[in-house]
């Protein structure tokens, strides 16, 4: 058997080069497409050591208790970014303090964001007319379930939103969202 000298060994051909280029491009696109999927299932969390997520305003800035109470009066229900970035109502109770629970603003019927109607003193879904009382309990369908609850905690003036896994105080049942 004869050995070929280094001058006789063929270099990478055009076909092999195109195969490597195609494989590299496809791999890059696939990895780029998987990043948002992985981020959805394992979101980055901001917050304290208690596992909470820092509530954020419409610009994505963390909310502080003193800043929030300076601009929101008793009985106010305003949207913040809560768990998983979902719109969540932060409630200022009648004592002028931030309530111990927040309400996920996503309607349980078809997923519309449910606005607070201060004149009617309830949440009314603009899509199909579902209505929820001041605590987010469904009072008129077609929504089948109450709005999801979230714990609201204050740690060093930071407003944190945490997963609610206890019994739903509105229905005395296990939470459907946990």
From Swiss-Prot:
Cofactor names: [2Fe-2S] cluster
Keywords per UniProt: 2Fe-2S, Disulfide bond, Electron transport, Iron, Iron-sulfur, Membrane, Metal-binding, Thylakoid, Translocase, Transmembrane, Transmembrane helix, Transport
Pfam families reported for this sequence: Rieske, TM_PetC
EC number: 7.1.1.6
Catalytic activity line of the entry: 2 oxidized [plastocyanin] + a plastoquinol + 2 H(+)(in) = 2 reduced [plastocyanin] + a plastoquinone + 4 H(+)(out)
Membrane topology annotation: Single-pass membrane protein
Compartment(s): Cellular thylakoid membrane
GO biological process: photosynthesis
Gene Ontology terms, MF aspect: 2 iron, 2 sulfur cluster binding; electron transporter, transferring electrons within cytochrome b6/f complex of photosystem II activity; metal ion binding; monooxygenase activity; oxidoreductase activity, acting on paired donors, with incorporation or reduction of molecular oxygen; plastoquinol--plastocyanin reductase activity
Record-given protein name: Cytochrome b6-f complex iron-sulfur subunit
Lineage: Bacteria, Bacillati, Cyanobacteriota, Cyanophyceae, Synechococcales
